[in-house]
């Protein structure tokens, strides 16, 4: 999942990262490549031109990108893509944008989207902060979904967590009024931090009331991170905020 860096010296790649001759300078996340299968590598070659969006650092007209006018949903840090693929299968009236730096997960989702014949999904293999700041117009998104971001469970690492005040303010800017932000975590203290940050962010109101949570929505499939957490005895918190 997406892992933002603070200014505390966490190591990043010092030079551009190249995958299938597409160069990207990694700036603001920890790159975790994992095991990259031949099938996932082939997916980049075969399906990236169909579903992939290369970062150019310029604001985009999302209706032009998708070739139609439809509600736009962004998932930040889609992991292996299970939730995004499920949503695209079951809610085809939406256009979906996914952002993920974990290359094997991107490759797996590319294969799945091709298998499904999906038409209205676009993927970034890049840093979410850069994409949001430089390529997404303010107010362009109807919904943002962030499922099971890295909890950085050690207290000294909490400042590396994705959900921080500046990032929350960025999300508010990109959501249209009337849109919503949906987050899920299986770490109690991260849920507390999410409430602390989001309740203090102008432009967001918790749909379930102060420090409230909602049942798992129909649009979110259970992820492997959720199953892992449940096996460890963790609860899952679903937080849903409206953009006002």
Curated annotation (Swiss-Prot):
Leading EC class: transferase
Pathway(s) annotated for this protein in UniProt: tRNA modification; N(7)-methylguanine-tRNA biosynthesis
Residues reported in the UniProt entry to bind S-adenosyl-L-methionine: 75, 100, 127, 150
Active site: 150
Pfam families noted in UniProt: Methyltransf_4
GO function terms (MF aspect): tRNA (guanine(46)-N7)-methyltransferase activity
Swiss-Prot/TrEMBL keywords: Methyltransferase, S-adenosyl-L-methionine, Transferase, tRNA processing
Listed InterPro entries: SAM-dependent_MTases_sf (IPR029063), tRNA_(Gua-N-7)_MeTrfase_Trmb (IPR003358), tRNA_methyltr_TrmB_bact (IPR055361)
Residues given in the record as substrate binding sites: 154, 186, 223-226
Record's catalysed reaction(s): guanosine(46) in tRNA + S-adenosyl-L-methionine = N(7)-methylguanosine(46) in tRNA + S-adenosyl-L-homocysteine
Cross-referenced Gene3D superfamilies: Vaccinia Virus protein VP39
E.C. numbers: 2.1.1.33
GO (cellular component) term, any one: tRNA methyltransferase complex
Function: Catalyzes the formation of N(7)-methylguanine at position 46 (m7G46) in tRNA.
PANTHER family noted in UniProt: 3-DEOXY-D-MANNO-OCTULOSONIC-ACID TRANSFERASE/TRNA GUANINE-N 7 - -METHYLTRANSFERASE, PENTACOTRIPEPTIDE-REPEAT REGION OF PRORP DOMAIN-CONTAINING PROTEIN
Family: Belongs to the class I-like SAM-binding methyltransferase superfamily. TrmB family.
Protein name in UniProt: tRNA (guanine-N(7)-)-methyltransferase
Organism: Xylella fastidiosa (strain M23)
């Amino acid at each position: 999942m997406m892992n933002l860096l603070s200014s505390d010296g966490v190591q990043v790649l010092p030079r551009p990262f190249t995958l299938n001759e597409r160069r990207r300078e990694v700036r603001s996340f920890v790159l975790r490549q994992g095991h990259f299968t031949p099938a996932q590598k082939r997916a980049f070659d075969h399906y990236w031109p169909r579903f992939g969006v290369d970062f150019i650092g310029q604001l985009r007209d999302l209706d032009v990108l998708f070739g139609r006018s439809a509600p736009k949903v962004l998932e930040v840090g889609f992991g292996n893509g299970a939730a995004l693929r499920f949503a695209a299968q079951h809610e085809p009236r939406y256009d979906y944008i996914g952002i993920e730096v974990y290359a094997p997960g991107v490759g797996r989702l590319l294969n799945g989207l091709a298998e499904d014949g999906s038409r209205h999904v676009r993927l970034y293999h890049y840093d979410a902060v850069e994409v949001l700041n430089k390529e997404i117009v303010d107010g362009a998104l109807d919904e943002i979904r962030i499922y099971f971001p890295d909890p950085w469970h050690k207290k000294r690492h909490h400042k590396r967590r994705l959900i921080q005040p500046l990032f929350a303010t960025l999300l508010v800017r990109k959501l249209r009024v009337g849109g919503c932000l949906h987050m899920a975590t299986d770490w109690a203290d991260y849920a507390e931090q999410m409430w602390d940050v989001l309740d203090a962010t102008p432009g967001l109101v918790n749909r379930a009331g102060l420090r409230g949570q909602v049942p798992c929505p129909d649009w979110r499939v259970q992820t492997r991170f959720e199953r892992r957490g449940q096996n460890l005895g963790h609860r899952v918190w679903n937080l849903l905020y409206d953009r006002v």
